[in-house]
């Protein structure tokens, strides 16, 4: 069994030794990827990041793998992306076809996730051109698009959407990106998502819609935006009648929007009218009359179907 000293000594020879000596070691059967330094870096890893590109090209020519993570779980490609080292990324792609684009960090982040953290657009474009999975998810089920929106990187988000990213992708809790931005109260991001096809009535694993979240969290501007975008008010296990009435009253939400949403809601007709009348929800009288007429007409039309 080889000692750690000998292993590290072989790493040093592979990473820093004369190339003729390296070639002799490889001919003798030394595994080019097995020998690492104390940080878990292979000779290829080390030479790329110390700038010895001729040696890196030599090692790649002799089948050194770019896919071996260091002690922090980061591959060469992942760290190049994090550092926005575009020239070295291109060098790697030009000198080997053996690059796994989907090896993830300990947090489950792919290189594409990493590229979005700092909105490294050129790195994103290069990865997507090489076939990176645009909807790949991390350990929490979040796609790269989740991260761009949550961190308000809308330029990166637009690039992902233009390449086919799923705007309604769900995480491990079945929350969509629209659900997740409620806590940030990011109106600009919400508008961006809705303009790009986000489903305003989609439910998570607790049957909450984005509107439910906005109402419960008392985010008036978001709630009104969702209502304007076709969100429907609903009552169920997650939002009973009293809670809904009190929350709407507390927010002083636009009555016209509530009125219009109730017309398309699957709440029963009696409850719709009661919602405008009870619990001190003071809708204008013409709204109540309009709703009553609408409900009456709905009953008449239903009778003739």
From Swiss-Prot:
The UniProt entry, under InterPro entries, shows: Ank_repeat_dom-contain_49, Ankyrin_rpt, Ankyrin_rpt-contain_sf
Coiled coil: which residue ranges? none
Q: Which UniProt keywords apply?
A: ANK repeat, Repeat
One Pfam family of this protein, by short name? Answer: Ank_2
Do you know which SMART domains this protein is assigned to? ANK (SM00248)
The segments carrying the ANK repeats are 5-34, 39-68, 72-101, 107-136, 140-169, 173-202, 206-235
**What is the protein's given name?**
Putative ankyrin repeat protein RF_0580
* Species the sequence originates in: Rickettsia felis (strain ATCC VR-1525 / URRWXCal2)
């Amino acid at each position: 069994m080889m000692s750690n000293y000998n292993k590290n000594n072989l790493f040093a020879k592979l990473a820093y030794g004369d190339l003729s000596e390296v070639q002799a070691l490889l001919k003798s059967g030394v595994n080019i990827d097995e020998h690492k330094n104390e940080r878990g870096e292979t000779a290829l890893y080390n030479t790329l990041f110390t700038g010895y590109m001729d040696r890196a090209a030599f090692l790649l020519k002799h089948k050194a793998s770019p896919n071996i993570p260091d002690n922090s779980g980061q591959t060469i490609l992942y760290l190049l992306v994090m550092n926005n080292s575009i020239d070295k990324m291109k060098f790697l792609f030009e000198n080997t076809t053996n690059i796994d684009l989907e090896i993830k960090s300990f947090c489950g982040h792919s290189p594409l996730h990493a590229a979005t953290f700092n909105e490294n657009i050129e790195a994103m474009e290069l990865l997507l051109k090489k076939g990176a999975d645009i909807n790949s998810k991390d350990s929490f089920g979040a796609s790269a698009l989740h991260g761009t929106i949550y961190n308000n990187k809308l330029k990166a988000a637009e690039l992902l959407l233009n390449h086919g990213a799923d705007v309604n992708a769900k995480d491990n809790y079945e929350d969509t990106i629209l659900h997740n931005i409620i806590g940030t109260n990011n109106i600009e991001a919400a508008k961006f998502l809705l303009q790009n096809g986000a489903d305003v009535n989609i439910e998570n694993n607790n049957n909450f819609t984005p509107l439910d979240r906005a109402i419960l969290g008392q985010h008036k501007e978001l709630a009104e935006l969702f209502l304007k975008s076709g969100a429907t008010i609903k009552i169920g296990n997650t939002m009973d009648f009293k809670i809904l009435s009190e929350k709407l009253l507390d927010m002083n939400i636009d009555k016209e929007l509530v009125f219009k949403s109730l017309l398309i809601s699957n709440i029963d007709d009696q409850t719709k009218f009661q919602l405008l009348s009870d619990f001190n929800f003071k809708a204008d009288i013409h709204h109540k009359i309009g709703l009553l007429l609408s409900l009456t007409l709905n009953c008449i039309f239903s009778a003739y179907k």
